[in-house]
């Protein structure tokens, strides 16, 4: 048996299900490209039949990614498999992942069928998917609670039908490691054709055991782990990719396993996913948390100073976290910025040097010193900028009365190239700015969440504002970055306004196309 563990990333499918606002196609592509650099073997990027937006994003990613296998999810239904195959057809290499529930509670309560009927559906789905590709994965949903006799029958039948990968999910995060390891061992002991497929696991974290269960599974013969960056996902989340990768790398002598993950890309990928998904990483999160390499105890600090491996089982550098936060000023040239970006793992294709350097100089003039984390924040915001913006912030002036708690804001917006100025009073500067923007634009945006975070250290740190807003029953995520909190807040709102404007344009175009088809059909 091979000692290579296949890393199947499902950040863009299972992970995205946990988000308050769906990612845009552009944001999904950014994450997919980062996952490709990270070295994931397979990336599951959507559920094409679920919506036109998901279909488009899967197709866009499939057309772009070259070094990882792109996968799409489909229920055990022909229409789902058709949509997956169509969206993936532009990929250099792709996989169709089809699934059906196998536990007694799911079969009887959800599917309302007999187990034999469900088995026939599974076999039919695998055979149908094989018409489009040899790389078909089949999942036994809720395998952790499926009677072992039924699970063995299902796995054997799916392999016989042509599935090359069989996934055993602990869908509700119910099992403990000894139990889950026993399930995997039973499959290897009892399924006669088990050697004809790769056994995969997909563990959820409802009891905090997803990583432990996944590691136990590979110790019993599984050779694919399904996971997400930062462990994001439904309910309590999924198995964490970075934890799996570093466990296998750090304990290689004990486990005798390896992955194809480029660990130096972990830190950057984690940051990107956290920012785009608007899901901050908890400080004490293993591997990628802010405190993961921080030592507060005097005894620990003394030990690390004497020998780093006294209290560090891996180095920050091993995950791409550079200890050298070299400060840069407005006198730093382009070559310095380019060098720092290269050291942080960014290629020239990841940013526009002219745009970045212009933003860098503006920031350096404001705060004097610019650090690595500032550059990363600037690159992130640059990447969110769209080619076509209907709204732009030209000027923002705020006056606050601390005794009354009131503030007045005057804003000048660029709306389709024309300047519009309005003023408003509110309960604090941000509220006043938002009311003035609404008055100038005529947009009524319902903000459901507002989050402020510091990007860096000290009083001159950049402030990043993330907002989630409701518009026509859809959620949109806006981000703003500035040394001034009110300015960052205004930028985040205008980002959302541009997103909603584009959504309206897309809906308008779809309506026109539908009308045109109707008229043609009537001729």
From Swiss-Prot:
Record family assignment: Belongs to the alpha-IPM synthase/homocitrate synthase family. LeuA type 1 subfamily.
Pfam families documented for this protein: HCS_D2, HMGL-like, LeuA_dimer
UniProt-annotated stretches for the region Regulatory domain: 392-523
Assembly notes: Homodimer.
Protein task: Catalyzes the condensation of the acetyl group of acetyl-CoA with 3-methyl-2-oxobutanoate (2-ketoisovalerate) to form 3-carboxy-3-hydroxy-4-methylpentanoate (2-isopropylmalate).
Keywords recorded for this protein, A-Z: Amino-acid biosynthesis, Branched-chain amino acid biosynthesis, Cytoplasm, Leucine biosynthesis, Manganese, Metal-binding, Transferase
All copies of domain Pyruvate carboxyltransferase, residue ranges: 5-267
Pathway of action: Amino-acid biosynthesis; L-leucine biosynthesis; L-leucine from 3-methyl-2-oxobutanoate: step 1/4
Residues the entry annotates as binding Mn(2+): 14, 202, 204, 238
Enzyme type, top EC level: transferase
Catalysed reactions listed for this entry: 3-methyl-2-oxobutanoate + acetyl-CoA + H2O = (2S)-2-isopropylmalate + CoA + H(+)
Coiled-coil positions: none
Enzyme Commission designation: 2.3.3.13
GO biological process, one term: L-leucine biosynthetic process
Protein name: 2-isopropylmalate synthase
Gene Ontology molecular-function annotations: 2-isopropylmalate synthase activity; acetyl-CoA C-acetyltransferase activity; manganese ion binding
Any GO CC annotation of this UniProt entry: cytosol
InterPro entries: 2-IPM_HCS-like, 2-isopropylmalate_synth_dimer, AIPM/Hcit_synth_CS, Aldolase_TIM, LeuA/HCS_post-cat, LeuA_allosteric_dom_sf, LeuA_bact_synth, PYR_CT
